[in-house]
A protein has these predicted regions:
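C-terminal secondary-structure termini that scaffold catalytic or DNA-interacting sites
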Residues: 2, 159, 170-172, 176-191, ...
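Short, polar N-cap/turn motifs at the start of nucleic acid-interacting alpha helices
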Residues: 154-161, 260, 279-299, 327
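Hydrophobic recognition helices of helix-based DNA-binding modules
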Residues: 39-43, 79-87, 195-198, 252, ...
Length: 365
């Protein structure tokens, strides 16, 4: 029988990681393995029974020098699992992680694209596959991992429906992570127009065989499917979200003169633009694959003031007759050209030019 009193931290970290293989998604397992490797280097071959609470606090001091709280909390997941495993085996009495709570992580504010930025992206020449994917992401709110796994078998153009059945995470096609994520997405007229254009590009492509990891993180089902979006550089479906970001999205933003952010912000843009327009929060949540509006409130939605309707005037018009007062009617704005938008963005990027223009305008009689 194994002498558990002689087991090291490395022994139990390995046991914990092994136990996770079929319990968590592959991407989570990769994260756990990465954190476990760093922890094994830190503790080395220290006996698991020799590690005390003070050692854990010293570790945190070291981690705080290099990592954000969110990442340190990911280390905690591995630590808790490792010591819990050891305690269950009787190798230790009490886990040194007992009563250790996660650190407060800073909330990362969404950074959705404004209408002016979206117009600039739309007006910039680039890979049509990538541009169509970008626009579809804004119009449907799906995850980028779901978008690059989208196939023509998932789309019913006549019924204006799209089904989210799988995602591409790292190197694996897998079923979506929650029951709500496997869903039907309504397609509006704009989305239909984009898909009809994309159909001409990939509708004739041969079906590809893929293996889809199921929700038990063990079973796999083979499928033959025609993918909607291709990487024009490889003439193959995008490998994963990181490739989409690197080969298309980042350079395309630079070309359009739009501030860089990750492709995940396209999903945020769907939520934020629709919230700002006063569209039902429940509908937004359902389209995005959430069972309620909590995630829209907490994580995805952000009020885009520059694109919001004039609600103050609308409020005044609503009560004007009540107080026997008159309110001026809203002035309809003509469509702003993409050239004008580009000019404004260029001036904003160079304050010295903006100051010069303001001086010239101010000097006019």
């Amino acid at each position: 029988m194994e002498n558990r009193n002689q087991n090291t931290f490395t022994d139990y970290a390995d046991k914990f990681i092994k136990s996770r293989k079929f319990r968590v998604a592959p991407s989570t397992l990769v994260n756990n393995k990465c954190k476990a490797s760093a922890l094994k280097r830190y503790f080395g071959e220290t006996l698991i029974s020799d590690i005390c609470h003070s050692d854990i606090l010293d570790l945190f001091d070291d981690l705080h020098e290099r990592y954000a709280n969110k990442t340190i909390n990911e280390f905690m997941t591995v630590l808790r699992g490792t010591f819990k495993h050891a305690a269950s085996d009787g190798a230790i009495g009490v886990s040194p992680m007992l009563d250790v709570k996660n650190f407060k992580a800073c909330k990362v504010e969404p950074k959705p694209f404004s209408k002016a930025e979206l117009n600039s992206l739309h007006s910039t020449h680039g890979c049509l596959h990538g541009k169509h994917a970008l626009i579809m992401n804004v119009l449907t709110g799906v995850r980028i991992s779901e978008l690059i796994a989208l196939t023509w078998e998932d789309i019913d153009l006549k019924r204006k429906e799209m089904f989210v059945r799988r995602a591409k995470v790292l190197s694996d096609y897998k079923t979506p992570k929650t029951e709500e994520s496997i869903r039907k997405v309504e397609l509006n007229e704009l989305a239909i127009q984009v898909l009809l254009k994309q159909l001409k590009l990939t509708g004739h492509k041969a079906a590809r065989e893929i293996s889809v990891l199921q929700s038990d993180n063990k079973s796999r089902i083979k499928e033959h499917l025609q993918f909607v979006f291709y990487n024009s550089q490889t003439d193959a479906p995008f490998i994963h979200a990181a490739q989409f970001n690197k080969t298309f999205f980042k350079p395309f933003l630079e070309k359009a003169g739009v501030e860089h952010r990750g492709a995940g912000q396209l999903r945020h843009t769907f939520a934020s633009q629709n919230l700002t327009a006063g569209i039902s929060k429940e509908w937004i949540a359902r389209q995005m694959g959430h069972s309620d509006t909590a995630m829209v409130d907490k994580h995805y939605g952000k009020w885009i003031a520059v694109d919001s309707p004039d609600y103050a005037s609308a409020s005044a018009r609503n009560l004007s007759s009540t107080f026997d007062m008159k309110v001026s009617e809203p002035v309809s704005m003509t469509e702003i050209s993409s050239e004008f938008v580009a000019l404004i963005q260029a001036l904003q990027a160079k304050p010295e030019l903006l100051t010069l223009v303001q001086t010239l305008v101010g000097s006019q009689p």
